Design a protein with these regions (language model features):
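Glycine-rich, histidine-containing beta strand-loop boundary motifs that form or position
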Residues: 42, 72, 136
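Catalytic cores and adjacent binding grooves of peptidoglycan-active enzymes
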Residues: 75-146
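Mixed-charge, low-complexity intrinsically disordered segments
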Residues: 51-91
Length: 146
């Protein structure tokens, strides 16, 4: 089960994340790019969820699907199951020190937003004291942490 409430986060991150979210939601540049909101896609993460994410691209598809089911996650497609999405079992999400944010367009999550949208979100997050995963060698554009 995915946690999306900011209350699950470390207190310092809650404060910074709220300010960053408010700034992103009010940002005229993001609005001009077609963003009509920002959603929290994940905050605190259970170890079973992290293990399911980590299994993608590393285990046979049926095993990945079983891991997702055991963690209470959505039914993952074969295409998703073979694509790696995390490179660690020690995510800061496990400690409540990370948050994933996604832009909304026409009220729906916009995972395939252009780089300019993710970059602007990253800049705003950094202005509020967050480290942005879009700067990493293996980019994680929705990810912000302390």
């Amino acid at each position: 089960m995915l946690q999306t409430a900011l209350d699950y986060l470390d207190t310092d991150l809650q404060i910074k994340a709220r300010k960053a979210l408010d700034a992103m939601r009010a940002d005229p540049a993001l609005k001009a790019m077609g963003v009509d909101g920002i959603a929290v896609s994940e905050t605190m993460r259970h170890l079973s969820t992290q293990m399911a994410y980590y299994s993608r691209g590393r285990m046979p598809v049926p095993d990945v699907k079983a891991m997702y089911a055991a963690a209470g996650l959505w039914k993952i497609s074969d295409k998703e199951a073979v694509k790696s999405i995390t490179w660690t079992l020690e995510s800061k999400h496990l400690l409540g020190k990370a948050i994933d944010l996604v832009p909304l367009r026409r009220g729906s999550t916009w995972w395939i937003a252009p780089d300019s949208v993710w970059s602007r979100m990253g800049e705003i997050g950094e202005q509020h004291g967050l480290s942005w995963g879009g700067r990493w060698k293996k980019r994680d554009t929705p990810h912000f942490e302390m």
